[in-house]
Amino acid sequence: MKLEHPDRLMNRTPLSLAALETHDAFAERHIGPDAASQQAMLDTLGFATRAALIDAVIPASIRRAETLPLGPFAQPKSEAEALAALRALADKNQVFRSYIGQGYYDTHTPAVILRNVLENPAWYTAYTPYQPEISQGRLEALLNFQQMVADLTGLEISNASLLDEATAAAEAMTLLQRVGKPQSNVFYVADDVLPQTLEVIKTRAKPIGIEVKSGPAADAAAANAFGVLLQYPGANGDVRDYRALADAIHAAGGHVVVAADILALTVLMPPGEWGADVAVGNTQRFGVPMGFGGPHAAYMAVRDEFKRQMPGRLVGVTVDAQGKPALRLALQTREQHIRREKATSNVCTAQALLAIMASMYAVYHGPRGLKTIALRVNRIAALLAAGIRHLGYATVNDTFFDTLTIDTGARTAQLHAFAQAKRINLRRAGDTRVGVSVDETTTRADLADLLTIFAQAAGATAPDIDALDAGLLPAPALPPSLERTSAYLTHHVFNRHHSETEMLRYLRSLSDKDLALDRSMIPLGSCTMKLNATSEMLPVTWPEFGRIHPFAPAEQTVGYREMIDQLEQMLVAATGYAAVSLQPNAGSQGEYAGLLIIHAYHESRGESHRDVCLIPASAHGTNPASAHMAGMKVVVVACDAQGNVDIADLKAKADAHSHDLAAIMITYPSTHGVFEQNVREICEIVHAHGGQVYVDGANMNAMVGLTAPGQFGGDVSHLNLHKTFCIPHGGGGPGVGPHLAKFLPNQRSTGYARGEDGIGAVSAAPYGSASILPISWMYIAMMGAKNLTAATETAILNANYIAKRLAPHYPVLYSGPGGLVAHECILDLRPIKDSSGITVDDVAKRLMDYGFHAPTMSFPVPGTLMVEPTESESQEELDRFIAAMIAIRDEIRAVEEGRADREDNPLRHAPHTAAVVTANEWPHAYSREQAAFPVASLVANKYWPPVGRADNAYGDRNLFCSCVPVSDYA
């Protein structure tokens, strides 16, 4: 049956109320092509119906027989209904004032940043800035982040964010293992490091043979460790002078990592000045809500000598084709997509949006504003200390920035009860102690409530705050020897935008430089840049989700946990697995967790020797990097001429490693954009040799509702919630089969446990990036089972339409039976380079002149473009992209035929900035109009790249990763 145009339905009368109720209206907003457009595209492909196309694309042997079993979410909700249902869950959470600390603090998000960054699609729908010319705004904001971190830590260079403080500390451990003394495999963790950090470090250390020791900081120098982790200030609040200890560790041949509070560093001597080699931490308290644990931007800063070993993104300064300053991601050869199992990290997605928020918090407040906030926090902590001492309590720590640990003896339970009555959370620091960590949001009234609680338990009257304040010396709790004297945030960007008008215009100027989904399609293969709907994003900023501490008592987080349970069951239904964990806070972390689960399974069966991971040659670089992190040996399986796993080679290698085979990692549909016909056979071969099947969920957007990895042989997968399930570039996974469910990650340090057999924590918070999980919940609730399947089918339709239209101009490298692809296609530009000298990079840069972000370049095959349009793009937008690609092919043909010079042509000089096109001198043989307006549609809506082509080689040769002086832009 053909799809019927909605106008025909509307003309039928009478219509009932049931027919007029718009429960599935969201699906029509999310799915770009309407019924008429879909039929036109199907006609182009030679299919009568969408169902017929899907039957031809997906192997019948793996098709899902039943509708997605979504239970109460099978029927779609309208946007209003879904928001109301989620609001009901959010209202079950109790927003207490949390003084728990432990790395998480309440904070004020400046409204100008909330509205113009966090809630602005120009910022949250953008992709990783691999195409620098159309990412200058985000790159500048991230460069500000790097400058902020480097200044505050006192170290030479910082990266552009990591996932959370605990994983950043684990990354620092492996960094120091690479550069440290070879005779040691010991990493020493001081006993006042945050407990969740220690647990993540232990998880990371075990599979790679690092021995983690923990004890008093004073014993660190004698531990013969290649690295030592210190907390500054300590978890209990102490501010210790570690200068002599750092010298002793260095003298013993070790290196020092410091986990430092970013706000405290505005008033405390930075770790780089007292001996730290690496600093890590969390920037959450710089304006990013707690969000039940995330997402937040962690940081890492290092001494200059370690910059090429540092994991994560690194923004650097270079010049463009006209010699003007331009920003780009530097030293990319360190990253997993290039170095694979030899990479320094498997970090694929950094916390860019949250890093931008934190950097803008510093820009808005400036050095003086930040110091004022820090001094106010410290003053409130000092007044609290004075008050409780007046009431007869003793503090464990005499020095502190914002945290007190208090001896409360037999009054402890009573104190917690009094606090609960005032809707206050104190840290449970044992049976006879409580902890209190104050923050930017703590007011005089809050301080009065805290003092009243301690007074009640003591049977006394709370002291007067003004009297305490009058009798208190300036900054009595900060050791004078550790007072910060060095300047920070001296660059003009941190000293100019302090009025809201200036800040608003600065943010607008940056977002105008970038190309995000709010301007045009981002057809990146393997990235699924689909709609992040506004109604999905709205709940992220609700205080009932944002102001919840990750270690808040369970009775305060009922709504969160109910929502998470529902989302886990939704994902179980979509994947065909038995259980899902949402703790991993990135796809790469999901991979890593999944492989650790596989290892735990083998270990439970007395087969811990199984450590070989088979990985197809076409795999994404995170696969071998994650396998290496999980302590596995990578054995590459060949692919055949059609891009499929070579079955003969797989059989040979599975047989050769039958005794020690742990797993195979496959992507489905394949990284080549094809539903491999023999995926069941692949799974059966590996299972026959005792291995487990890891199905990379990066391409789940081609499977939802149509097939499921848990049903065709997969044992474990990670899910990229930021791809298939609409979270802006974020994280997800893993899902596992029934025999692996008991091994899903725990977080024992905070009391979160799925079972005694679970692996250790892989993220700092029990539920990872919890505050963005409502996005996926909303998406699934508003789509329902039928429309989720329709979205998958439309993604496949859109990809095949592009492949069909472009095939006469660019060969489609891989396809399945009937010449069909899955949800993405690979265009082969290698013959073009041979015939014209035009490279895939030239085409990518030229697309910017047409107003498009390039498809994925040279992955998985060098010299190709991988195109993934997603279901969210309309036929009109697809046709605009197709027209641009055809026009570019015509420009290439002009070079091939000698009508255009091989060097002086619009592709080689792309992209063209407004400054270049309007300059007095025009040195090119082609016209200004051809440079800037190659198609007529650009006249009405033109995006101008802010810089010319970035010089990558210059940037890496002359590495500079700090803010650029204004004079350089003159």
Curated annotation (Swiss-Prot):
Enzyme Commission identifier(s): 1.4.4.2
UniProt keyword Transmembrane, yes or no: no
Biological process (GO), any one: glycine decarboxylation via glycine cleavage system
A GO molecular-function annotation: glycine dehydrogenase (decarboxylating) activity
GO cellular component entries: cytosol; glycine cleavage complex
Cofactor requirement: pyridoxal 5'-phosphate
Residues annotated with N6-(pyridoxal phosphate)lysine modification: 723
Database matches in InterPro entries: GcvP (IPR003437), GDC-P_C (IPR049316), GDC-P_N (IPR049315), GDC_P (IPR020581), PyrdxlP-dep_Trfase (IPR015424), PyrdxlP-dep_Trfase_major (IPR015421), PyrdxlP-dep_Trfase_small (IPR015422)
Keyword check for Oxidoreductase: yes
A family per Pfam: GcvP2_C
Keywords from the named record: Oxidoreductase, Pyridoxal phosphate
Catalytic activity: N(6)-[(R)-lipoyl]-L-lysyl-[glycine-cleavage complex H protein] + glycine + H(+) = N(6)-[(R)-S(8)-aminomethyldihydrolipoyl]-L-lysyl-[glycine-cleavage complex H protein] + CO2
Quaternary context: The glycine cleavage system is composed of four proteins: P, T, L and H.
PANTHER family: GLYCINE DEHYDROGENASE (DECARBOXYLATING), MITOCHONDRIAL, GLYCINE DEHYDROGENASE, DECARBOXYLATING
Function: The glycine cleavage system catalyzes the degradation of glycine. The P protein binds the alpha-amino group of glycine through its pyridoxal phosphate cofactor; CO(2) is released and the remaining methylamine moiety is then transferred to the lipoamide cofactor of the H protein.
Family from the record: Belongs to the GcvP family.
Identification of the protein by name: Glycine dehydrogenase (decarboxylating)
Originating organism: Burkholderia pseudomallei (strain 1106a)
Gene: gcvP
